[in-house]
Amino acid sequence: MRLSRFFMPILKENPKEAEIVSHRLMLRTGMVRQQSAGIYTWLPLGKRVLDKVNAIIREEQNRSGAIELLMPTLQSAELWQESGRYDAYGKEMLRIKDRQDRPMLYGPTNEEMITDIFRSYVKSYRNLPLNLYHIQLKFRDEIRPRFGTMRSREFLMKDAYSFDLDRAGAEHAYNKMFAAYLRTFDRMGLRAIPMRADTGPIGGNLSHEFIILADTGESEVFCHKDFLGFDIPGEDTNFDDVAGLKTIFDKWTSRYAATSEMHDEAAFGAIAEGERLSARGIEVGHIFYFGTKYSEAMGAKVLGPDGKEHTVHMGSYGIGPTRLVPAIIEASHDDNGIIWPKGIAPFDVVVINMKTGDEACDAACGKVYSDLGKAGFDVLLDDTDERAGGKFATADLIGVPVQVIVGPRSIANGEVEVKDRKTGARETMTVEAAINKLVAAR
């Protein structure tokens, strides 16, 4: 992508309405634009990041055996009345009526709808286990939306729902998602710590929040430092291995970890002082096992191997991509801008032409741009007429992991400069060497 043809409306000044770093940087870089309170348009730069986040989520959900579908944003009130949650849910649920005066709602969550889909088609234990997921917009009418897309009214969610014959099967489904979430966040450059959580309005008796540490986090968290060194489940993880996944779950829940809402000061105090970690954190995922809460209320049953009807056991598993993007920024930035982890950066490499219009610079930039593109890189070529200092500032601000800097002096010697955005390390080498180095490191 040539920057001269890309839509990236960068703000020169920090927006006054932004309270936290991620909100400020997302507005400044032109990732998002606020349309009204808590409602945002994702502009091209932000959409590229969001798409890469969603791609990783999909890959790990599919790897774990979950199957994607897509449910609508509007739901019938009848399903919620059947489950008993229509009146119990607060004012954050947007209730509307269609032209036939039928009560509808803009879905804040999807337990009722997915249970209705399941009971309509699945009648036998032979069709279990089953895990269905979708990535869809939701709406919750927050009293005070704030922090940009971190806490907005309309937001994107990945919701997965598992169905099993009994609790043992449901716990295995829970452990699958537990391991999948660890892998998902790790691939985005995050160390997410699972913490026992309150089940809230979703219900159930087993729940974990996945928290990343960030100075501006909304929650105060307390945990053992061992979490910072635990191994992440590998790409070869066998999601059908009941014992293996239980081992992963047991390891990651063997140390103390809690947010302030669930904190036990006595249990935390029993940890050696040097092994305690107290910090701020941001929730990036939440998983629940809620047993038969919805299936019992809505008659979701299957015939078991004994020929009798069994009410299925369910779980739900959520990740908010539009919340995850600012959370990553909160955890990975410096005074100059965003530092994107490689897997989710809007572009893999930015080629900076310090003197657009110079024949040698244009030719070298064109070669790097073309060759890296053919090798599968997402490349941004800054071919604008902006001064060099402004180009460097823009590259740092938007956080592309690698910068290839092409200037008249260096290219006269057949060389370019390669800069690592995260470390600031710079290396001068030939054009061919730079291309080969980046391709080899991919």
Curated annotation (Swiss-Prot):
It is found in: Cytoplasm. Belongs to the class-II aminoacyl-tRNA synthetase family. ProS type 2 subfamily. Its EC number is 6.1.1.15. Keywords: Aminoacyl-tRNA synthetase, ATP-binding, Cytoplasm, Ligase, Nucleotide-binding, Protein biosynthesis. Homodimer. InterPro entries: aa-tRNA-synt_IIb, aa-tRNA-synth_II, aa-tRNA-synth_II/BPL/LPL, Anticodon-bd, Anticodon-bd_dom_sf, Pro-tRNA-ligase_IIa, Pro-tRNA-synth_IIa_bac-type, Pro-tRNA_synthetase. The keyword Protein biosynthesis applies. PROSITE patterns: AA_TRNA_LIGASE_II. Pfam families: HGTP_anticodon, tRNA-synt_2b. GO terms for biological process: prolyl-tRNA aminoacylation. It catalyses: tRNA(Pro) + L-proline + ATP = L-prolyl-tRNA(Pro) + AMP + diphosphate. Catalyzes the attachment of proline to tRNA(Pro) in a two-step reaction: proline is first activated by ATP to form Pro-AMP and then transferred to the acceptor end of tRNA(Pro). It comes from the Bacteria. HAMAP family: Pro_tRNA_synth_type2 (MF_01570). Its main location: cytoplasm. CDD domains: ProRS_anticodon_short, ProRS_core_prok. GO terms for molecular function: ATP binding; proline-tRNA ligase activity. This is Proline--tRNA ligase. One of its GO terms (cellular component) is cytosol.
